[in-house]
Amino acid sequence: MTAWLGASYVLPILLVSFVQTNAKPEKTKMDCYKDVKGTIYEYEALTLNGNERIQFKQYPRKHVLFVNVATYCGLTAQYPELNSLQEELKPLGLVVLGFPCNQFGKQGPGENSEILPGLKYVRPGRGYVPNFQLFEKGDVNGEKEQKVFTFLKLSCPHPSEVLGSFRHISWDPVKVHDIRWNFEKFLVGPDGVPVLRWFHRTPISTVKEDILVYLKQLKMK
């Protein structure tokens, strides 16, 4: 009996070790599928202050970067870097769009009206103000996910095979293309079709380099 109990404890440990050892490392990015049907121009979203419903068809011939953001996350430091990215690549047609979400570690709590003060005075703080458009807070996974994120996720494979810890998954249903954490990014081309998807921990400097390579390749076509 004692031997059986010992084996029952050891087996799960061995299985966990096997899974961790054999898990493939995350890629920093993935190319989106070549046969995507539809464009972002079919979708819209309400601005953070609730005053305007923006149709994404107002971004024709622009390179649009969709980012699901959160205020109280270890990656919130990417906010100022996104400002720099917007400023530096705006002359090349880049538009950054931010979508606050509270689905990952409950790191985007509060009302829409609390988001900008939280960014300005808490994280990243020091008077920070985003220079790109933020939209109202909403889900990016699950039954109530925003339709544009349904489209983006189905258009691009995820850079990681790991869904993450079940204690962080609060939505249903769970799908393989789901966003894993705050600050994942999708780049949409000038025709409204998604082209690239980045893992959330990919540095903004790498995202910038990837976008510049993409723009150079696009120019050569």
From Swiss-Prot:
It holds the Pfam family GSHPx. It catalyses: 2 glutathione + H2O2 = glutathione disulfide + 2 H2O. Its main location: secreted. Its EC number is 1.11.1.9. Keywords: Oxidoreductase, Peroxidase, Secreted, Signal. Protects cells and enzymes from oxidative damage, by catalyzing the reduction of hydrogen peroxide, lipid peroxides and organic hydroperoxide, by glutathione. May constitute a glutathione peroxidase-like protective system against peroxide damage in sperm membrane lipids. This is Epididymal secretory glutathione peroxidase. The lineage of its organism: Eukaryota, Metazoa, Chordata, Craniata, Vertebrata. The gene is GPX5.
